[in-house]
Amino acid sequence: MSENQKEVRVRFAPSPTGRLHLGGGRTALYNYLLVKKMGGKFILRIEDTDQKRYVETAEQEIIDGLHWLGIDWDEGPDKGGPYGPYRQSQRKEIYQRYAEQLIDQGDAFYCFCSTDRLSEMKRLQQQRKEFPHYDGLCRDIPVEEARKRIAAGESYVIRFKTPKEGTTTVRDLLRGEITVENKTIDDYIIVKSDGWALYHLAAMVDDHLMKISHVIRGSEWIPTLPLHHLILKAFGWDEPVWIHLSVFLKPSGKGKMSKRESADLIKDGYSIFLTDLKDLGYVDEAVTNWIALMGWSYDDRTEIFNMSQLIDAFSLEHLNPSPAAINFTKLDYFNGVHIRMLEIDDLAQRIQPYFEADGYTADLDTLKKITPIIQERIAGLDEAPKIAGFFFEKEVHPKLEDLVQKGLDAAQCADIATKSYQILSALPVIDKDHGEPEMRALVEELALKPAQVFGVLRVAVTGQKISPPLFESMEIIGQDVVLERIKNAEKMLKAA
């Protein structure tokens, strides 16, 4: 970061080769929190130079995932800005120009080695138990000779010419100084044979031209950090502040979490992909809270944060480079807490799509009545239709074994249904104040346990052994429908 640069400028630069996962979401979040705390600019840059792995729908899914987390940006493909274009596929000529500059100043070279030669070279190195590296065959070909070969149609790539003597030291904010021997740094390809620049060149050029002050990214880039340092040094450019985040471990704490293992998590109702977590009923506030604490902490006590509180509390000094195990139990806890913190109208709107996905026509007005009596009972938005779908069913279909209560037979339970119908049909209205006192009197009259009488009534009205508060539920369902359901249960019990 230049001494003269005052503004904090960060970038989140995903490759549209797949869905946005927890690692990408956390990287974007930390960049966003830093900018909001420091008053800088957040840049979204799409690194789409790998055309073979490009997935057409991935970019929009990444954008949707960021928006779901509550993250927005100041500059990007959809917003423009002073340093665009913000898609690397539209910057090919820029990278080519800078690659040629490196060649002209002796910091890069054209390589004409065939795939077959490189494969044989690698095989022999493995046989000799050497560290795989380019052997430098084309490293000292004169530039004019190389350009004549290119003009004649010979295929080539461009490699960075790393120094082979001495050491390179780079400072990472979390890990301190990282020093490597230059002889261990390969002559990496920076431009492929199809003319597309690789990340090592493209990202460094873009970070410089877009005036990026802090690079917050995954720890998988640490091995090539010395290369990136050398590329910037070759151009004479200032370095950003480097911040390489901690690795995510599997829930067991053993081994690095990978995208390939997400299929196994889905079986247990979990995922490392943000769109899956949304579909599984997690609220964005909980996911944001959760991933923020996997690599950062405010103190050893405070766990619950909304986005505003995260911005106020965030600091780079509290980032932790130690690997973080993915703890889905903690996510479930956060989800329940944040659901209970939502306003009723907000929660009603959020659960509506889950009712519709389960086949219910759930109007918002009714949902606003239901939400207060289920808010404390759901740990995920997807649970709402499972415990409250009966509000929107024309008929419920209770199981006979659920209607028959412990210690009673079908005839006794039919009698409970008959008497319940008589009591409730005589009331002007059924609600939490009208119905429950009368039903408790019935419990005394029949000399039964409350669970037996209310158990018959609950299953008859809701079709479920467990439900939201019974009389509040009956008020929302409406007296006519309640009585019809009790009558149907009575018939079922008498026929048993």
State what each model feature region is.
Residues 10-16, 44-48, 210-215, 269-274, ...:
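Glycine- and acidic
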Residues 431-477, 481:
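Helix-rich, typically C-terminal accessory recognition domains appended to large enzymatic cores
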Residues 2-127, 224-237, 286:
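N-terminal Rossmann-like or analogous alpha/beta NTP/dinucleotide-binding catalytic cores
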Residues 109-264, 273, 298:
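Active-site cores that bind ATP or allylic diphosphates and position pyrophosphate for catalysis
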Residues 235-398, 406, 462-496:
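Catalytic adenosine-cofactor/nucleotide-binding cores of aminoacyl-tRNA synthetases and other
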Residues 403-434, 439:
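Long, amphipathic alpha-helical coiled-coil segments characteristic
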Residues 2-4, 373, 409, 428:
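Post-transcriptional modification and biogenesis factors for structured RNAs
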